[in-house]
Amino acid sequence: MKEKRFFPEKGLLMLSGVAFLLLTVPAWVQGFVWCGVAAVLLCVAVWRLPVSQQKVRALLSNPAHAALSLAFNGALAVNFYHIWIDSQKMQRVAGWLGMENGLFVPLCAAFFAIAAAPAAGCVISYYISAGQEDYRRTKAETLRSGETGIPMGKALLILFAVSVVGISAILRANFYYMDDSPRAALGYKQWDYFSRYLSTALATLVHGGDYLVDAAPLPQMLAMLIMAVSGILMGYIFCERTTFSGWELAVLSILGLNPYFLGCVSFRFDAPYMAFSVLAAVVPLLYRNRNTAAYVLVSGLGILAVCTSYQAAAGIFPMLVVALALRMWNRGKSIREVGLFCLKSAAGYALGLLFFKLVIMIPADTNYVGNALPSAGELIPHFMRNLRSYYSLILSDFKPFWRIAAVLAAAAFCIRTVLDSRRRTLPAIAMTAVTLILMGMMCFGLYPALASTVFAPRAMYGFGVLLTVFGMTAAEGKTRVPLKIPAVVLSWVFFVFSFTYGNALSVQKDYTDFRTQLVISDLQEVEAFRSDAPVTVQLSGSIGKAPVLWNMPQNYQMLNRLIPDTFGGGDDLTQYGFYCYYDLQNVVWNPDVDLRGMDLPVLEDNMYHTIRGEGSYVLVELK
C-alpha cells in the first residue's frame, strides 16, 4: 500500500518548524523577509519528505528529547524577548491587539518556544537515534576486527582529566580575562552584536538565568569537556573504530591544550561557547554516510551553530572534509564517491552560511572586527595577505623547538598518508600536497577574507585543529612509531606551556592588584576626595606586563599575545576593575571627558604613577 504523502503529523511539523524559525529571527526587516522564504521552503521540504506516519510518531514520542527541545527553545525564547522588546514594529502589533508590549512579547516568546518543540524534538530524536545506530555498528565492526585499545567512554574520561589538569594553573590564577571584568560586574551577555545568538541562548542555560553570574571554574571545565568530546568524536570519525591507543589520546590533547585555544579557555564566560563551535563543526561528519538530505541538513545546522556561537571555527568543518576526502581516495574510493561527499558537504556548508547571512547576521563594524568583505577584485589578494599575516604570527608565537615539532608533525602526516595509500606514489604525493595546502588555507575560516579582521590568539584555534589532524593521522594504529613522536612531543610541550601560561596569569593578576592598590592609596591623600563632591578620575598609560614576565617572552613570545593589558587607560576592559571593583567613593568615570589635554598640576609623582589634578578633575598617569 502506498504511503500517504501528507498526514496530520507532517502538518504539525510544518507549523512547528515555522515557529522555530520565528523564534530565531532577529528584529530586522531583511532577516524577517528571508525567514518567510525559508519557512516556505521548509514546508515544501517537509511535504516531500519520504517518511512514514509511524516513523514521525516514533520521533515525536520520546519524552527526553521533547524535554531537551523545550529547554533549548526556552533559552531561545529569552533571546527573542531581548531582541524584540524594544522593537517599534512589535509595539505597533501589540497596540493593534490592545496589549502592552511588555506582556505581548513574553507571550509570543513562550508561544513560539512551545510551538517549536515538536520540530526541534523530532530533529534531535532522529539524529541521536541515527548516531546511536552508527555507533553500535562501528563497535561491532571494531570487535570483529580484533582491534584492542581504550574504549570510547574511558578514553573520554582520560582526555577530559588530562585537559582539566592542563588548565589547572589557569583555573588557580582566578584571572578576569579581558571582558570577564565587565561581565562579572554587570552580568550582561551582548554576544548578539556579533550575531552569536546561540552563545546567548546557551549562556542562559549554563548560568541558570538571564543574568550572568560568575560561576568559574564551571564554564571553563565545561569547555574542556566539550573539547574532549570533540577530540574523541574526531578520532571516531577518522579511525572508524570505538577504541583508541595511548598515542592517539596523547595527540588528541592538542585540540584543547594548544596555545591558541588556551586563549579561549581563559575566558570565564565565553569559553564553553568557543568550545561548542568546535563541536558543532565536528558533529555533522558523524552522519556523512547517511542519506543526502540528512547529511546536508545536519551540516547546515552545524555551520549555523558555528556562526552563531563563535565564527572563528568556520574553517574547521571544510578542513576536516578535505582531510576525510583524502583518506577516502587513498583507501580506494572512486573519484565519483569522493566528489559526491565533497559536494554534499559543500551544499550543507553553503546552506548554513546562506541562512546565517540572509536571516540572522546583522552587519557589525567595530574597532575589534567587522563582517564586511572587500570588493570582488580585492578579495583574493586581501585573503592571501591576511593569511600570510596569520602564519607570520604563528612563526613568531612558536619557539624554534615548537616550530620544528610542528613541521615534523606535518611531514609525518604526509609520509604516513603516502605510505598507507593504495594509490600510486606520485599521485598520492600530489594529492597529499594539495590537501595540505587546502587545509592550511581553511584553518582560519572566513576571517582572512574579512575587510577588518582579528588576529588575536583566540581567533586562531583552527590551527590547533590542523595540528590535531596531523597528529591523529600519524599516530593511527600500532605501527610506524617514529612517525608518532613529533605530534606526541608537541602535545607534551603544549601541556607544559599551559602551566607556564597559567602561572604567568597569576603573576600578572598579583601585579595588577598591587598597582591598583597603590593608585587607590595615593588618591586617598588627594584633597579633592576629602569632601563628598563627585570627582572625575581618568586613567592614562598602562602598567604593561609584570616585571617577572619581562624575560619570559624571549622564550615564549606566545605569552606576549596571550596575556592582555590589565590596568590602564584608553580601553574600557582595562578600567572596569578599577572603577567597579573597589567601591571608590565619589569617583566618577566619564569617558566623554579627556583630561590629558589639560595642563593639570602634579599632585603626586613616584616610580609607579603620576597623579595630576585640579578641582573636581584628577588624571592618573600610569608608568
Regions found by a protein language model. Give the residues of each.
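Transmembrane alpha-helices and membrane-interface helical segments
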Residues: L41-R48, A115-C122, I232-Y236, V283-Y287, ...
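Transmembrane catalytic cores of multi-pass membrane glycosyltransferases
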Residues: A19-L21, V29, V33-G36, A75-L97, ...
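Membrane-embedded helix bundles of polyisoprenyl
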Residues: G246-V265, P272-V282, S299-I303
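Intrinsically disordered, polar/acidic, low-complexity terminal segments
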Residues: T142-Y193, Y197, A203, H207-S230, ...
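Membrane-interfacial loop-to-transmembrane alpha-helix junctions, especially the N-terminal start
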Residues: F6-L15, V56-S69, G153-L156, T242-A250, ...
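Start-transfer (signal-anchor) and selected internal transmembrane alpha helices
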Residues: F7-L15, R57-S69, F104-V165
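Membrane-interface transmembrane helices that cradle and orient dolichyl/undecaprenyl
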Residues: A280-V296, M328-K333
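Signature aromatic-anchored transmembrane alpha helix within multi-pass, membrane-resident enzymes
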Residues: H65-A66, F72, E476-F499
